[in-house]
Design a protein with these regions (language model features):
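Short, aromatic-rich amphipathic segments at membrane interfaces
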Residues: 190-212
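Membrane interface segments of multi-pass transport proteins and intramembrane proteases
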Residues: 18, 121-131
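Non-transmembrane, extramembrane segments of multi-pass ion/lipid transporters
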Residues: 55-65, 263-268
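Membrane-interface helix-loop junction between the first two transmembrane segments
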Residues: 43-61
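Juxtamembrane helix-capping/reentrant segments at transmembrane boundaries
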Residues: 59-73, 127-138
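Alpha-helical transmembrane segments
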Residues: 2-44, 83-112, 144-185, 208, ...
């Protein structure tokens, strides 16, 4: 809202009003504002939750070999994250921007879904929370809405790469002069960096474009659901999900800025996406909220984000990647989320297969994979066999595991950005 106010005042040459037209100014201001809101509101939210005695009452001692006391810590801290994102975004962003609208809707939608899950766990004393099928329906629904909006909205357009020329020993990429609806997406490790969904559906003949858009919508649903669940699984140690997500947010912010700038888009040979600079503002709010939340969520945590936070965080990451046509980079950028999800799938499916044979065989000590690194041999199920029982040879403290996962995510983020120049 303030953006429109100061743009109006700029007509009357009010000193400083022109600064609001610069994306860098608004983005940095949003980051600072979000961080301060998160720090200020977080402290008060924690005190209020403790007064109301709203906290997790049941913790699994089998995955806490170091005896760190976790009972009595308030949860549903995702409320702090959501407020810290939305307030500065609404104040400082261009709220009529289609991409910003999609991000706000995603935040509210998945925030509400996660809130329902936490509410059932805490107030209904049901540790299972919202049934898995309802979570999936909620995630699929927002993925469908985002995919359909990007397909049908006249404002969601790109300017595709058109020509490649050599000038003074440098590659110069020219973009189409007209913005178009595009099914192209950036793909790493190939020469032209682009994959067209319609080309995959070329067997559909004259219907290949429509089929390509259907494939795009399906891909959007899969991305949003997968990343949202991956972030949810990653939220198992103090500061783990918030720290990893902050790093991912920085990488996505860089990708969004490059995609919104025709010069940088040409240099890196990727699609130029007009008006996507508002995603930079949103992602700066996201980063600020993560850092501010870490102030209280770092070990030993004073508050947990709960599903209110983790489902929302994953959805934000997935939708943002789809909007800037970088969803195929997520297996690298969100590698930690991917491994967390894969470990759970491997563990559950392998156990089911072996159980049919009358055996109780597990692959890992515990899943998600971060729990595998802190579980003692003495805490393992004596009736089960473990394929990787000796890995690791000793458990680690959760703060060490968290920091190592952060470092891994930083490396993966760097690799993701490097892929833009690898061709």
């Amino acid at each position: 809202m303030l953006y429109y106010l100061f743009r109006f005042l700029d007509q009357y040459d009010i000193p400083g009003s022109h600064m609001w037209s610069y994306i860098s100014f608004r983005a940095l201001l949003t980051l600072i504002f979000s961080l301060l809101i998160s720090a200020w509101f977080g402290e008060r939210f924690i005190k209020w939750m403790k007064r109301k005695k709203i906290f997790e009452t049941e913790r699994d001692p089998s995955i806490d070999p170091f005896g760190v006391e976790k009972k009595g810590v308030p949860t549903m801290g995702g409320v702090v994250i959501i407020v810290s994102i939305l307030v500065p975004v609404i104040l400082l962003g261009r709220v009529r921007n289609i991409y910003l609208i999609l991000m706000v809707v995603t935040t509210l939608w998945l925030g509400f879904l996660g809130f329902l899950d936490d509410y059932i766990k805490i107030f209904k004393r049901n540790k299972e929370g919202l049934k898995g099928k309802y979570k999936i329906v909620g995630q699929v629904s927002i993925g469908f809405i985002v995919g359909l909006t990007l397909w049908l909205s006249p404002d969601a357009v790109v300017r595709e790469n058109m020509d490649v020329k050599m000038q003074n020993q440098e590659i110069v990429i020219k973009h189409k002069s007209e913005a178009v609806k595009s099914l192209q997406t950036t793909i790493p490790f190939i020469k032209n960096h682009n994959l067209n969904y319609s080309s995959i559906m070329s067997f559909c003949g004259k219907y290949k474009v429509a089929a390509g858009w259907m494939l795009f919508v399906i891909m959007t649903i899969l991305v949003v659901t997968a990343v949202s669940n991956g972030a949810n699984l990653n939220d198992g140690m103090d500061g783990m999900c918030a720290g990893n997500s902050a790093v991912i947010g920085v990488a996505l912010g860089i990708l969004a800025y490059v995609s919104s700038h025709i010069g940088y888009a040409s240099y890196f040979d990727i699609m130029y996406i007009p008006h996507s600079e508002e995603l930079v503002v949103f992602l700066c709010a996201f980063i600020g909220a993560m850092i501010g939340f870490l102030w209280y969520n770092a070990f030993p945590a004073q508050i947990f984000m709960g599903d209110t936070g983790s489902l929302t965080i994953g959805g934000i990451i997935g939708v943002c990647a789809v909007i800037i046509h970088k969803e195929l980079l997520l297996p690298i950028l969100c590698g930690i989320f991917f491994v967390e999800s894969l470990s759970v799938i491997i563990q559950t499916q392998w156990f089911k297969i072996q159980k049919r044979k009358g055996k109780r065989v597990r692959v890992f000590r515990a899943t998600p994979i971060h729990d595998n690194f802190r579980k003692l041999d003495s805490q393992l199920d004596a009736t089960s066999q473990y394929i990787l029982k000796g890995w690791p040879h000793r458990p680690f403290h959760e703060s060490k595991i968290t920091i190592r996962f952060w470092i891994t995510t930083i490396i993966l983020a760097a690799i993701t950005l490097i892929t833009l120049k690898m061709r």
